[in-house]
Amino acid sequence: MRLLWGLLWAFGLFASSLQKPRLLLFSPSVVNLGVPLSVGVQLQDARQGEVVTGFVFLRNPSHNNDRCSPKKAFTLTSQQDFVHLSLQVPQSDAKSCGLFGLRRSPEVQLVAQSPWLRDVLAKETDTQGVNLLFASRRGHFFVQTDQPVYNPGQRVQYRVFALDQKMRPSKDSLLVTVENSRGLRVRKKEVRDPSSIFQDSFLIPDISEPGTWRISAQFSDSLEANSSTKFEVKKYVLPNFEVKITPRKPYILVTSNHLGEIQVDIEARYIYGKPVQGVAYVRFGLLDEDGTKNFLRGLETQLKLKDGKSHVSLSRVELEGALQKLRLSVPDLQGLRLYTSAAVIESPGGEIEEAELTSWHFVPSAFSLDLSNTKRHLVPGAPFLLQALVREASGPPAPDVPVKVSVTLSGSVPKVPEIVQNTDRMGQVNMAINIPWGTTRLQLLVSAGSLYPAVARLEVRAPPSGSSGFLSIERPDPRAPRVQETVTLNLRSVGLSRATFPYYYYMVLSRGEIVSVGRERRQELTSVSVFVDHHLAPAFYFVAFYYHKGQPVANSLRVDVEAGACEGKLELRLDGTKDYRNGDSAKLQLLTDSEALVALGAVDTALYAVGSRTHKPLDMAKVFEVMNSYNLGCGPGGGDSAPQVFRAVGLAFSDGDLWTPVRETLSCPKEEKARKKRSVDFQKAVSEKLGQFASPEAKRCCQDGLTRLPMVRSCEQRAARVLQPACREPFLSCCQFAESLRKKSRAESPGGLGRAMEVLQEEELLEEDMILVRSFFPENWLWRVLRVDRSETLTVWLPDSMTTWEIHGVSLSQSKGLCVATPARLRVFREFHLHVRLPASIRRFEQLELRPVLYNYLEENLTMSVHIAPVEGLCLAGGGGLAQQVHVPAGSARPVPFFVVPTAATAVSLKVVARGTTLVGDAVSKVLQIEKEGAIHQEELVYELNPLDHRARTLEIPGNSDPNMIPEGESSSFVRVTASNPLETLGSEGALSPGGIASHLRLPTGCGEQTMTLLAPTLAASRYLDRTEQWSKLPPETKDRAVDLIQKGYMRIQEYRKSDGSYAAWLSRESSTWLTAFVLKVLSLAQDQVGGSPEKLQETASWLLGMQQADGSFHDPCPVIHRDMQGGLVGSDETVALTAFVVIALQHGLNAFQDQSAEALKQRVKASILKADSYLGGKASAGLLGAHAAAITAYALTLTKAPQDLQDVAHNNLMVMAQEIGDNRYWGSVTTSQSNVVSPTLAPLSPTDPMPQAPALWIETTAYGLLHLLLREGKAELADQVANWLMHQASFHGGFRSTQDTVMAMDALSAYWIASHTTENKELNVTLSAMGRRGFKSHILQLDSRQVQGLEEELQFSLSSKISVKVGGNSKGTLKVLRTYHVLDMTNTTCQDLRIEVTVMGYVEYTRQANADYEEDYEYDEFLAGDDPGAPLRPVMPLQLFEGRRNRRRREAPKVAEEQEPRVQYTVCIWREGKMRLSGMAIADITLLSGFSALSADLEKLTSLSDRYVSHFETQGPHVLLYFDSVPTSRECVGFGAMQEVAVGLVQPASAVVYDYYSPERRCSVFYGAPEKSKLLSTLCSGDVCQCAEGKCPRQRRALERGLQDEDRYRMKFACYHPRVEYGFQVRVLREDSRAAFRLFETKIIQVLHFTKDAKAAADQTRNFLVRDSCRLHLEPGREYLIMGLDGITSDLKGDPQYLLDSKSWIEEMPSERLCRSTRQRAACAQLNDFIQEYSTLGCQV
């Protein structure tokens, strides 16, 4: 008995201990910086009347338990035993308690402190806590861009909306960053905007690779809170119409014995909504999970569109036949996708657009099942809710689908009846399954659909059984609630025979915080109502618990809220649903429910057709997604134990005995899903060949070998160009394999079109399709923010595009937060309109055919009158205004041809007008750019102005009369006078001009090294202006422009960065030591301006250390510049110069090592510098360095503070080589060196002579010398002399010769000007006098250094005028002359060493020759007829379009018969002769023939394949720039195709030039012309258009054509009255020559009748006469002519005048003696002789 009583006493004591009072502490498991922390404190099992008081706060257990927040008091009683507190987390407290210093375990402790814990519960301390994860994230950000996709080179406009945790506007400062497609940060900006809407823009570099860019925003003090938006960058042009491919069923059902129907609809509509009439070409293929595409042969089809629509069906037999060719069967299709491509050709304009369908899956079932919302824990004895979501195989919810559930239970009832229920409209089904008591496991087999159902299995287990029972949460209405609705939840305890707890306690959690807490008295069925407001959207957790016998029992449930509207209101309304016309105004009404800022933007919906489907505009779905990202819960709810339940919903919990472990990460653990990867083994020759190579690199090399070039090369020749040996073998093997396939294909083909078609199908397997479309007006507009108080009506004027605009609106309100409106669509359309296409440019007197297309979408036929409005400078039919009558049937389109001949070199506005009999009509105005004949030529002269030297106070600048100058061409001498003030070179006209110094170099900026010219000179200028505080002397916007230029340069250079921190001239190349060092040096100086990452610069420095050799020198595996010719007493100094260059970069790079964590790497860098200094010192001591190597070595040793003896040796060596003449000191070539390629430059013979312009290498060398002197001696006499020479080497626009010399000269001069800065006033007075058209004219310039303006002046003079200059004042200055004019012919002596040759061939002739060289005579374009690119062609077969689009820049379909666009083949050959070497890269700049554009696909092949022929290419208007690494001694030729976009006749020769990039004075320039006997050289015009074009042409008079009818003395009237000639000669024609767009006739004077300027004219002298090629005048060599006219402005090589023959010239053939002896002509001959005698003797008697 005693034992029994003892056991009963012990049990009672144990039970009483279980029922002891407890303090429960609840909190979100994550603490966010600056965001109030919601805390729940509950008093459990307290005695009646008990009161507990205390505080809650946060502390850092890793930092002496320092408090991280203020204390928050609480009071608990037995009646009010659950309180909800808000605990502030200020940034200042978090910082002071050391939270920011936590790195490995960012944990913080939530503590409840109360004496009750110690006094009543007898704990050792008065505290109880739980550990939380600390995160610095807070708030919400939404980033919006003005477009979803951009072209490289376009400007991106974006907005950032900043909101706090409550979705209200935040005014805290933001950090906005931009990442490029390779994940590199290219822009960082810290901003603060009181409106909470930050707006900015930036320019995407034009050399950017295609890919996805990202704009991210975060609070400056909470860097973990990061929200971003993505946008796509790709080369595109907007489509004119959109093609859609819509399958009848979004999936294809396939099983072992079944294949579902394959039916697809093709629809084509213009962007403004109207259907397209034309033809569709459709083809099919298979896609595996990796996206590998394999076409299904034989399924291609051609369809005619009716009302813009067509339909395609594939039968099982057709598909099986195509699969057999791939050795596949129908069951093999599961897991693959059916690729469908459609190309639609519009009938009226022949334009082509395409679409692809890549999401058409072969599936075993029509549906998919998602059971993720179903709990994984059951409550025995309570209903279990199965929540399933059924989707169609293509993704959307599937309504009204039967769902069958088979249930297997453990325990006494193993199986329950099958349950069947149909899905609701959202594709959801909710089934309550009654679970008997005692069930421990539930197995569910769920199937959706009756035929070929989707099946899913789920096993659910009960939590471990206990004496405290289970808590069941049941939803009577399981559907998702909406905002403003109430959710009812029933609570029930299960498994308790006798429940003793009085209350259920519950919490509602949403977005990572406890929204509310409460309790409900326990009943048989306890109901809790939760009102759903905006704070609970888009989902919330309901958590309930009770304590029984001291044990917590809990359960939870996630409730998804149906996504609806925003908390506030924003509605966009347009005035009606009517269509608008371009240029109309529209009224846009903005409706809100409170005062708000509304951000607007309108985007062309055509962009959605161009961009990826993943880049969508901001909408409320994205807003809810961001809001839900703060939700800390994982899964649908429930758990094995109370702590697990709390942890699963994102709660931290402690009751003193139990607690939840600290959360590890912010995100939920991801479920691992088994993914079956399926690939298709296609037994095709090409696939087999590719399959022979395992590595991706070898496969790429093989793919390149399979690709055919746009020029003739054998496989062996191609393989020899592949640099990597590992790539060379697969490349050669695959190239030879492809050639054998082509030969085999030719042998098996019957010939003609079929043969070409087969080749096309084989070739298209070798590369991905390039889809390019044509441009059509603006892409976005209406980018503005305005304040709206409930209603605002905005009148907007619509752009000229005919398209559908989508207007987006986002509002931000202080009371309602952010709201994204449903976009408003606005269609801009004209039922009748016309479309005009113009070439990029055309030359004067070329003939242009315009073909405006008239579109009629009315229901009636139209007769339209179409004309081109008269405009000066254009020859038009009837002088302009002469109309053509065109019949345009309803619903059709018609082209109308017009012929135009430009006669003036200018930009003219060409207006095409179409009028109908009713109010129907349209007009389009576009600018036609007309250029002069020949090529532009520029030359510069630089004079030093020194009023302190009496010899230099007056000087004369001679005029220029180049014999090569084009007659009637504009020619001028521009004169710029500057004082000796740095602001001229560095200011708003120099390095800080809108385009920077780089824009003045007249050089391209395509490679990595060239890109630095956007950055380095601007940094030098900014550094000078910051140091001398002179920004105020420049225009106010100059500082902003400098920041913009620096940001652009930084973004651009990041495109060349590799993952290891190194840089390459091209991303496809190996990294360059020299370029990497150059970037490190510049970016180290630009850290503050660009916001670059120091860690990235440290990576760059680390890479450079790996390039150092054992002796301390550096080597370059892929040099950008070859400096082995730069001079030196013996041999090459390249290694020395490179080592010094890297040392300089590393020294500057030490600025990036401020962080203590990088100290070890910093010491390695310093050790590397010391080692390199030792190497450089040894080379300097040997005394064998050339000037360039000596200068850079001296500067490097001085900069790094090397041992003084090494510095002295280097200094002395350098000064020995200096050349000093007058006040100038510089370093050029060393005359004793054998490796110099430039002869010494002499100083001017006298102070009034122009300064000779030195080559780029001399300027760079002298710049290093100046930097060395400034570091060693400061501003002294030597530095003054060097700087004086350097300043006078700058070009007219402020730059120097090339990139390196410009960068270094600007760097050196800015350092000099900082050292020599003075506030002393300087004056320079200059008087310039010259003879002008209206007599002698003088200009007086007074330049004062204290004036903001007036630092420089620019004047224009006639090219031939002599300019007298007088100088006064107390300051030196510079006078620069820029002469510019157009030339007939390229005469350049450098062509003796450097050569370029350009030939243009008709594409058919080229194809024949190419095929002959390939030993095959086919090509898919072989069916072209004749050699003339303008000749009629045979009809185009459908599949040729798919290959053809790769070769066309524009998406223009081939036309039939006379409408076929001509295509030509360009061949560009370069080589060098003699021993001349280049410093490195050479650039060929080819100006295309008028109307042509290069085929980008051809140019891409030259640069992107393994056998690379060109490093890079650029297209700029009519120019194609090709970058070559070097110029060989033998001819190196590359080829590409070009397509004529607009018909042009009488095409004039165009120019081409090749030059050494680093020494541009080494160049060769040539003209080239169109193919002989080509239509390009024929006349297009007719009638009065031709007469107008020839209006300026001379008329040739036949011998004695008027006979005796000379009573009016018409010869004498022409000579003396109108036009009154200035010369008269009787000449004999010696020869005829072609000069650019002119013909030159060399003649011998027989008799001088009259002269004005030509005082030296005499018998037997020669004179040249020029006439335009477009004129029909023809003078026969050997015959004599009487020629009279006006004096010319040009001279020949001997200085004698040459004359232009035009409409004011008299040309009469002299009669032969035989003709004059005839009786009929004897008198007429006498009259002619009398005129010659009288005019030569007496002249004009008036």
From Swiss-Prot:
One of its GO terms (biological process) is inflammatory response. GO terms for cellular component: extracellular region. It comes from Cavia porcellus. The keyword Iron-sulfur does not apply. Residues 701-735 form the Anaphylatoxin-like domain. It holds the Pfam family A2M_BRD. The modification Sulfotyrosine is found at Y1414, Y1418, Y1420. This is Complement C4. In absence of complement activation, circulates in blood as a disulfide-linked trimer of an alpha, beta and gamma chain. There is a cross-link at C1007-Q1010 (Isoglutamyl cysteine thioester (Cys-Gln)).
